[in-house]
Amino acid sequence: MANFENLSSDFQTIAMDIYSSITQAADLNNNNSNLHFQTFHPSSTSLESLFLHHHQQQLLHFPGNSPDSSNNFSSTSSFLHSDHNIVDETKKRKALLPTLSSSETSGVSDNTNVIATETGSLRRGKRLKKKKEEEDEKEREVVHVRARRGQATDSHSLAERVRRGKINERLRCLQDMVPGCYKAMGMATMLDEIINYVQSLQNQVEFLSMKLTAASSFYDFNSETDAVDSMQRAKARETVEMGRQTRDGSPVFHLSTWSL
């Protein structure tokens, strides 16, 4: 056991010497990109191989080599090999982690891109549909703007223009018939003048109709008085004629057709 402790101390001293020599070599070759000994650790693969080789040589030449020491050496070497395997697996896992994370990130990004593309296409489709509906509504709406001379906006505007042309023609006829209307007047003023003129004509017609009614009733009364007078004169004439015939002695067969 004491021999093994001495061997362990010798191995540590040798490992430190090897590490110092490797560090010095790395300092001399800083410009070499293939060597990165600044982060070199005694537990790396090269150091372990050197340590094992030197340990085997020391065991072979060490006096008083015993089976116990050989067993200790085998256990130590197996421990170092297992540690080396663990380090390799850790390195592999660390190397695989960025790949897995990058693949997962790329998958998530692809899914996000697909979702964003679908959302964008849906929004674009809705926007185009809404724009088309707005254009259809604008086409169905009536255009109230004034068109240029000789042009028209749509059928409704054409019909409206024809209607306004007829109204203007009737207004010009009224201007010619109604005194006091001028072309320079506005539409409202001209309509007021026409209304006043029509009201005055209505009043005149009512007054004339009243006078005509009074005149007609007076004419009917005079005609009845004249008829009575004529009948009375005819009766008197007939009476005189009958008296004359009676004096002459001729019979009278004449019957009067007049009645009172």
Curated annotation (Swiss-Prot):
Keywords: DNA-binding, Nucleus, Transcription, Transcription regulation. Disulfide bonds: none annotated. Residues 151-201 form the bHLH domain. SUPFAM superfamilies: HLH, helix-loop-helix DNA-binding domain. Residues 118-139 are annotated as: Disordered. GO terms for cellular component: nucleus. It comes from the Eukaryota. Disruption phenotype: No visible phenotype. Redundant with BEE2 and BEE3. InterPro entries: bHLH_dom, bHLH_ZIP_TF, HLH_DNA-bd_sf. Induction: Induced by brassinosteroid, auxin, ethylene and cytokinin, and repressed by abscisic acid. Insensitive to gibberellic acid. Positive regulator of brassinosteroid signaling. This is Transcription factor BEE 1. It comes from Arabidopsis thaliana. The lineage of its organism: Eukaryota, Viridiplantae, Streptophyta, Embryophyta, Tracheophyta. The gene is BEE1.
